[in-house]
Amino acid sequence: MANDPGFTGGTLDRADHLRNDEAALARMRADPAARVLLLEGLDPVPGEGGGLGWRSFVAHDDRAELLFLGLDGDAPRFAALRPEEPRGGSMAVLQLLHRLPRHEVAIYGAARSLVDWHYRHGFCARCGAVTAVFRGGWGRRCDACRAEHFPRVDPVVIMLAEHAGKVLLGRQPQFPPRMYSALAGFLEPGESIEEAVRRELHEEAGVRATSVRYVLSQPWPFPSSLMIGCIAPVESDAILLDTTELEDALWLDKAEVGAVLRGDPGARIMTPPPLAIAHSLLRAWVEE
């Protein structure tokens, strides 16, 4: 779909049934068609054709553990977990990702989240002992207490409050000049998606949702969020900002949002680029 956000549309077969099969993993590592994703820290390295860069196993660093990403047809694809922790990835990587094919952005996103999770979880959360990779890279096991740990995903609601044909966009202090986006926040323990949307809208902007409608979702690998996009009609357009979260908020109608999405030079604000779910959510609302 044209409105699908970045990091979706992956084409690898994740082949979960092979992750516990050590013999199959060994065969795949020995397959001449196997490739290892090139990363500089946590950032992708462009390949010769302008897509993701891949390395054959001949050039593979033997010190690195291999994380099984999946199958591209019959060809195994891996990411490398190196002994040294990577330097923090830069958000400037988003500029490169805009130039990659959509399915490759999805591959990179999954690899980045997985590699980053391993670097953050080298020790057991139960007993503190060192953990080791298992399940082809989709888990870590503690030999001391036998606890097993698996990659986590942090759910985030991102939503458009809607009233009288307009939607509410907010601006955080760290945003680039003129940038506004949909309001967002992490789900808390014991909360449903609908409850989180209502709470976040009221906390950040003082508006009360009368209903909540799910629209679409997006994995966001910085480091491991799942963005859950919703639209929520609200009782009133009166705004009461939480200035610890937002420095400004405003209502825009469909004509104004359409102008922003088209990049019209006269548009009074900017919104996140097509890679971000906020862009897809706004486009879905305009096209309703």
Give the location of each predicted region:
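Cys/His-rich short segments
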Residues: 109-160
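Conserved hydrophobic/aromatic beta-strand scaffold that supports enzyme active sites
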Residues: 68, 78, 123, 158-160, ...
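Active-site-adjacent beta-strand/loop module that shapes the phosphate/pyrophosphate-binding cleft
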Residues: 218-243
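Nudix hydrolase/Nudix homology domain
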Residues: 1-121, 176-180, 243-288
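Hydrophobic alpha-helical positions that pack around
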Residues: 183, 197, 201
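A short glycine-rich, hydrophobically flanked beta-strand micro-motif that places a catalytic Asp/Glu
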Residues: 210-217
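N-terminal strand-loop-strand
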Residues: 140-182, 186, 208-209, 232
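Surface-exposed, charge/polar-rich loops and edge strands
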Residues: 191
